[in-house]
């Protein structure tokens, strides 16, 4: 046995890019993408991606370079998930909801060489590049045109997306990874403009999470997948590559619209879709909501869906699955594996069970909850709190240019520390209770409390500020800012609160702006003078939901 070693035949680098060429062979005439009046087959998609990769290479993009994309869920965004890494480059999909200031920071931090930008977001990118310091060469921009969108531009482009596709070589030999540990994707997670956190994943981890997600969700061949989840969120939880593996049809939509979703689900017999709990709420509350002709599998993550929302969506024919994941693990790595006997329970009992994040998926080796002081496993009693830790093949390589933060997250004991607080129930199912890291999840978007607080503190009238999550039945959570101001609370407190909200709107993306501002004489502190956020969270929780009418 000792003589049997790895060799070139059995140690070829794993990469999900091979799914595309297989799809072209096995599912060549099957529809791969539908977007308005545009439709492609898997054979056409493979050809287009090869041509695009060829043209990208001709622009001087080489192995290890970063290519960024700012676009919604359109065919170009999907194709770039293959075409960019086919050149050996690293794909960086940027959240379209960010402002120009933050995008400029990410482009500089990642040393992006080339940016594909949808024409709707062109003004945003132009503004972002003007913020580059003198002497810093901004990246080359490639315009993604769309006949469905009207927008004017005075920018003179040397390259457009479709021109690159047409000019490329369909027989291009794509650049295979030299090692399966070669970087493939870069995704920025919560962080500040001064310290962005860029999560880098290898071809290996993306291969593993993709196969893992398909198996865990029991995705069969030829699914019809509706893109309600932004592809810039952890690359659409890996289903961008997963649909090629199973010959699925990608139904693309530029912007989430409830009426359009209902129409597309019926028109194309959609079988699968993903999204934050807020999407479930919007679908089930829509006046256009009607009983589905066929069941639709819906995978959601983040805050668990409220019982009322779960009941409404299930009554329409959606089969809701709940999971837990993080950018550092490339997607959903814990899921609430459903047991048949649970179907006989009441709606409230089912919702209580489904609120639990669940058990590890097969692509993760171990998930545990450990005491934050001793590092020992906590009791399996559903009560003892600890930090959620995990290990497995889909864990990130690390944070770009930040070895210190990487070592704080991936520690010498071999575990990735998530910063999330949870419990393990007696049946082994995990339930997230809180977060060590101060992050609010609002409508599926991560809101870093520290960054919001830094903006609130910029207001000359603010003395103290603390931002916490206020539970919301529609958005899951919304930012709630507690502040003390110079001169103390005055009779016109409503005006003070409105002024702070407006102040933040001018300096933050809309989803990060506090929806609630509470002016206090003084924020509660402990004996060391630290603001007691635990007390503030309780106050925010007692306020109830802003969206009470949405339920």
Q: What are these model-derived regions, one by one?
A:
Residues 207-224, 232-272, 282, 286-287:
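Conserved AMP-binding/adenylation subdomain of ANL enzymes
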Residues 360-389, 408-409, 426-427, 490-497, ...:
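Conserved beta-loop-beta connector loops within the AMP-binding
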Residues 8-12, 17, 29-74, 78-82, ...:
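Conserved AMP-binding/adenylate-forming core of the ANL superfamily
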Residues 162, 245, 270-275, 284-352, ...:
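Gly/Ser/Thr-rich phosphate-binding loop
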Residues 41-43, 184-209:
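Conserved AMP-binding A3 loop
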Residues 98, 115-117, 273, 392, ...:
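AMP-binding/adenylate-forming catalytic core of the ANL superfamily
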Residues 11, 28-31, 142-143, 148, ...:
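Conserved pre-ATP/AMP-binding loop-to-beta segment of ANL
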Residues 19, 58-59, 82, 86-166, ...:
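Structural core segment of the AMP-binding/adenylate-forming
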């Amino acid at each position: 046995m000792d003589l049997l070693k790895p060799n070139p035949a059995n140690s070829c680098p794993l990469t999900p890019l091979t799914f595309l060429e297989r799809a072209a062979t096995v599912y060549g005439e099957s529809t791969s993408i539908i977007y308005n009046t545009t439709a492609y087959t898997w054979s056409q998609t493979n050809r287009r991606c090869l041509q695009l990769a060829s043209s990208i290479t001709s622009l001087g993009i080489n192995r290890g370079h970063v290519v960024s994309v700012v676009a919604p869920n359109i065919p170009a965004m999907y194709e770039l998930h293959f075409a960019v890494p086919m050149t050996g480059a690293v794909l960086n999909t940027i959240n379209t909801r960010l402002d120009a200031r933050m995008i400029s920071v990410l482009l500089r931090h990642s040393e992006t060489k080339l940016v594909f930008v949808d024409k709707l977001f062109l003004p945003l990118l132009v503004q972002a590049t003007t913020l580059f310091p003198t002497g810093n060469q901004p990246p080359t921009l490639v315009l993604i045109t769309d006949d469905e969108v009207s927008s004017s531009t005075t920018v003179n482009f040397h390259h457009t997306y479709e021109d690159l596709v047409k000019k490329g070589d369909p027989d291009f030999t794509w650049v295979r990874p030299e090692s399966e540990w070669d970087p493939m994707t870069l995704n920025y997670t919560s962080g500040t403009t001064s310290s962005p956190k860029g999560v880098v994943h290898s071809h290996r981890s993306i291969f593993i999470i993709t196969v893992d997600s398909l198996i865990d969700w029991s995705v069969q061949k030829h699914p019809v997948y509706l893109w309600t989840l932004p592809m810039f969120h952890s690359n659409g939880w890996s289903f961008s590559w997963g649909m090629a593996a199973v010959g699925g049809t990608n139904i693309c939509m530029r912007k989430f619209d409830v009426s359009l979703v209902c129409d597309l689900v019926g028109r194309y017999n959609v079988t699968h879709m993903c999204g934050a709990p807020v999407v479930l709420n919007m679908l089930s509350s829509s006046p256009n909501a009607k009983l589905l002709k066929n069941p639709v599998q819906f995978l959601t993550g983040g805050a668990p869906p409220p019982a009322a929302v779960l009941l409404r969506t299930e009554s329409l024919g959606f089969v809701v699955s709940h999971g837990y994941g993080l950018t550092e693990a490339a997607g959903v790595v814990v899921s609430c594996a459903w047991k048949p006997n649970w179907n006989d329970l009441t709606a409230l009992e089912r919702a209580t069970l489904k609120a639990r994040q669940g058990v590890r998926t097969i692509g993760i080796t171990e998930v545990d909850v450990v005491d934050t002081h001793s590092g020992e496993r906590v009791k399996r009693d559903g009560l003892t709190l600890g930090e959620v830790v995990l290990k497995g093949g889909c864990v990130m390589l690390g944070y770009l240019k930040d070895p210190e933060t990487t070592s704080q997250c991936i520690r010498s004991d071999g575990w990735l520390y998530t910063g999330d607080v949870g419990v393990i129930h007696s049946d082994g199912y995990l339930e997230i209770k809180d977060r060590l890291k101060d992050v609010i999840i609002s409508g599926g978007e991560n809101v870093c409390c520290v960054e919001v607080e830094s903006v609130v503190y910029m207001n000359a009238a603010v003395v103290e500020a603390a931002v916490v999550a206020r539970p919301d039945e529609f958005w899951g959570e919304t930012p709630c800012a507690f502040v003390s101001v110079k001169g103390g609370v005055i009779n016109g407190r409503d005006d003070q609160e409105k002024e702070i909200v407006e102040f933040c709107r001018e300096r933050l993306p809309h989803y990060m702006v506090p929806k609630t501002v509470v002016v206090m004489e003084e924020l509660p502190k402990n004996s060391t003078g630290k603001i007691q956020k635990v007390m503030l969270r309780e106050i925010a929780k007692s306020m109830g939901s802003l969206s009470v009418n949405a339920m």
